[in-house]
Amino acid sequence: MGNREMEELIPLVNRLQDAFSALGQSCLLELPQIAVVGGQSAGKSSVLENFVGRDFLPRGSGIVTRRPLVLQLVTSKAEYAEFLHCKGKKFTDFDEVRHEIEAETDRVTGMNKGISSVPINLRVYSPHVLNLTLIDLPGITKVPVGDQPPDIEYQIRDMIMQFITRENCLILAVTPANTDLANSDALKLAKEVDPQGLRTIGVITKLDLMDEGTDARDVLENKLLPLRRGYVGVVNRSQKDIDGKKDIKAAMLAERKFFLSHPAYRHIADRMGTPHLQKVLNQQLTNHIRDTLPNFRNKLQGQLLSIEHEVEAFKNFKPEDPTRKTKALLQMVQQFAVDFEKRIEGSGDQVDTLELSGGAKINRIFHERFPFEIVKMEFNEKELRREISYAIKNIHGIRTGLFTPDMAFEAIVKKQIVKLKGPSLKSVDLVMQELINTVKKCTKRLANFPRLCEETERIVANHIREREGKTKDQVLLLIDIQVSYINTNHEDFIGFANAQQRSSQVHKKSTIGNQGTNLPPSRQIVIRKGWLTVSNIGIMKGGSKGYWFVLTAESLSWYKDDEEKEKKYMLPLDNLKVRDVEKGFMSSKHVFALFNTEQRNVYKDYRSLELACDSQEDVDSWKASLLRAGVYPDKSFTENDENGQAENFSMDPQLERQVETIRNLVDSYMSIINKCIRDLIPKTIMHLMINNVKDFINSELLAQLYSSEDQNTLMEESVEQAQRRDEMLRMYQALKEALAIIGDINTVTVSTPAPPPVDDSWLQHSRRSPPPSPTTQRRLTLSAPLPRPASSRGPAPAIPSPGPHSGAPPVPFRPGPLPPFPNSSDSYGAPPQVPSRPTRAPPSVPSRRPPPSPTRPTIIRPLESSLLD
């Protein structure tokens, strides 16, 4: 039974399944399947058993199928079954198959009617089946029993939808003929996921159990309640047949005899029964497989491309080749050197867009981090001026000097140059760490050989640390060279003359009033900016207030905020001095004041301007900045150290001018030194560390690897890598084979066009007003009789009224006479006691009227309520 094309097609699909099941990827490859959907006791399991030709599925009342059963039928000379959870075990007794299904179901769901979405995978080999893959799903129910949860209806629905929503799943909607087809939950679920009806095939079971005098002819002919793929009727064995040991072969013969002998079905007997259902499914499966092949091929090609680059390295792997390890070692070291160079020097191909490479990070160290460390090394202005003052006084000793001593300048400059050692050595440490990180990233390619990876990393890291020491020695030497000779004749150095002139300009204040904006740019250089609180003015106005202050060489201005758009006032620095103010008892601020030596008002009606900071360090810093602008402390408020310590700021104008001169000289010379150091340190690191490490890797690494350990030990492959290589090669071959199989399928098969769409709106409107279903009984429920052709039979049979019990024989009654039908012959030879159908037009004379309504007597029983109402 079955067609030869399908017998050639499905083994190819099964080969696809087998190829990927071995790799654990069958779940990722959505191969076409057929899902059997229906209500409880609809005959789903019986349909499956007819395919297999054996009794092997559990039977009983209520919910029997409690887990999805994935059934793969394979044509074979021998007859046996295999479970995925019992690999290698063949079941030749199908009673054992039934017991194993029940036992496996109970292992997961328990023994009290519980359900689970975990499928049972069963493959049946038999000469009596076609090659098909089907899924038996739990029957649709609404009332929970046993251990079933209250939402059993929704759980089963979700489980069914999990399978039938896949676009590559054909839906076998099973509905008993003795129930209302219009309310079939199976067809409604299929309609939800397959609105076009391209994947849905209707199956009508229990045709032999319909009430006498009724049939499902109009449904099977797809005239009433149509589906795009139509319906196939089947007759399954009854429980009595099973108890009587009626085998499948006898059941098939009985099914064939039923359709040939039944007057309503014998003209379509060749399109009914399990054999025809198998052929229909095979053809639909063929079409579906061919339709899904393009997407399937794209998926396989995508997987193949994703691993092809990696597999390329494994293709030429020959474990038996004695020179393999030597070649591999040379290739690995060469690749490591290339990777290291690319990460340091940069590369135009395969640019990493996720993180900075080692070379880019070193560039940031050279041009961002190192200059920042130098700038961060700020001079304490107050401390620096004190040191300059001490140096001048100590050089003069007991004498009173007339000139600014250059030895004080050299002493201060040398001390500041030595401070550059810290940032310079720190930059060496940062570059060394980045080189080691780069080596670790490059050795990831050597991870397949653990010992080689470990030795390479160790040897190169040791060399980097060795070069680190030599680089630091050279950096310290550069600093010492700068300390050894102070070149005051440098072209960029301002010299003593310019420094003294600049210092004298600080003391010569021009009386320009409040016109600082007209000064030349050199006089408008900002010395300091920051927030200060004006305390004495704010007290009279209800509280102190903060302003943004800007100090230049000529004025002190304050603004509303740091955007410097709204200027409040600009105070000239002429004749101003600074003094300390005692902190108030309740105040947390530190205050200093500016006042005019000529007893003039500083700001409006105020003789002094009291400014507050959050800390004493801020006060000292502002006072030092004011000193640079020429605002000196008041003598009367200068505190002397009684323990022999010198005063913080000398009030000797000559000394202050000398301090300012040396301060300017120190600034000028240190800018020259900083520029030189910022240029030389990166060059030194580049030459002694980075370039040296690159040369070492290219020229000496291989020799040191050979001398450090035996070659065979170095090139021992990790177990994980060997397994991974074998797995990748197997995957690669399986993907290539799968693509070849797809090509074979396209060659040996032909698609058949889908049938035209039909009006299946009855599925959408059945909730509101279900139409009469001929699969239960034909009912004459119209308010007025439809016009019929004339008939010679006389009045139509009566509509029987329902008896007191649903199973009691009906009592017929006759309505008024109907118009006669045009023909009187009965082409179906119905028995005399059952009125037969009216004859239809011969095939050669097409009828212009719709098919006449049936005239056989029908039995009226109460309508079954829809499961979806």
From Swiss-Prot:
Enzyme Commission code(s) on record: 3.6.5.5
Region ranges (Disordered): 752-869
Keyword Transmembrane helix (UniProt): no
Record-linked InterPro entries: Dynamin, Dynamin_GTPase, Dynamin_GTPase_CS, Dynamin_N, Dynamin_stalk, G_DYNAMIN_dom, GED, GED_dom
Location of the protein in the cell: Cytoplasm; Cytoplasm, Cytoskeleton
GO terms under cellular component: apical tubulobulbar complex; axon; basal tubulobulbar complex; cytoplasm; cytoplasmic vesicle; cytosol; dendritic spine; dendritic spine head
Region (G4 motif): 205-208
Disulphide bonds in the chain: none
Any one Gene Ontology molecular-function term assigned to this protein's record: type 5 metabotropic glutamate receptor binding
UniProt domain PH: residue ranges: 525-631
Domain Dynamin-type G: 28-294
Keywords attached to this entry: Acetylation, Cytoplasm, Cytoplasmic vesicle, Cytoskeleton, Endocytosis, Golgi apparatus, GTP-binding, Hydrolase, Microtubule, Motor protein, Nucleotide-binding, Phosphoprotein
Tissue: Isoform-specific expression in germ-cell-depleted testis (Sertoli cells), brain (peripheral sensory neurons), lung and heart.
SUPFAM superfamilies: P-loop containing nucleoside triphosphate hydrolases, PH domain-like
Residue positions, PTM N6-acetyllysine: K299, K604
Binding site for GTP: 38-46, 205-211, 236-239
Chain positions covered by the region annotation G3 motif: 136-139
BP terms from Gene Ontology: endocytosis; filopodium assembly; negative regulation of dendritic spine morphogenesis; positive regulation of filopodium assembly; positive regulation of synaptic vesicle recycling; receptor internalization; regulation of dendritic spine morphogenesis; sperm ejaculation
EC class name: hydrolase
Region (G2 motif) residue spans: 64-66
UniProt similarity note: Belongs to the TRAFAC class dynamin-like GTPase superfamily. Dynamin/Fzo/YdjA family.
Protein role: Microtubule-associated force-producing protein involved in producing microtubule bundles and able to bind and hydrolyze GTP. Most probably involved in vesicular trafficking processes, in particular endocytosis.
Protein's recorded name: Dynamin-3
Protein source organism: Rattus norvegicus (Rat)
Lineage: Eukaryota, Metazoa, Chordata, Craniata, Vertebrata
Encoding gene, per UniProt annotation: Dnm3
